[in-house]
């Protein structure tokens, strides 16, 4: 499911939750941007496509990105499920965002094994072999440090 997390920014962080070694991690979900079209998929960067479209010409349309390099450890106190149910009182913009998030979530569910495997691989490469993966290490957050910080505030 999609979840949101409070941040210092004006909007919450939106992402999916996975388990890595018993620790919950949020993988940030980024809205589609033009710059993503020419970027190649990498171990820490997963493109989300509109595969549910009835129109084949849209099946390769990028509708979001999962940034594994920016996944963060979280605890239950900061996780809240996002309501994606369409409501007749929603504004047109809110309806459009919900439909996009429904498509993104559907794609993530269909590709959950790949997402989990890649996230675990990125985590392992950064925490176990940082010197062998310097470019990846530069792009990624420090998972160990973030886990230590979270443990100071965590009660679950």
Segments (PLM) and residue ranges:
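Conserved catalytic-core segments centered on acid/base and nucleophilic motifs
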Residues: 13-19
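C-terminal terminal-subdomain/extension
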Residues: 49-156
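General N-terminal targeting signals
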Residues: 10, 34, 41-43, 83-91
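Short, small-residue-biased leader/transition segments that mark boundaries at the very start
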Residues: 2-10
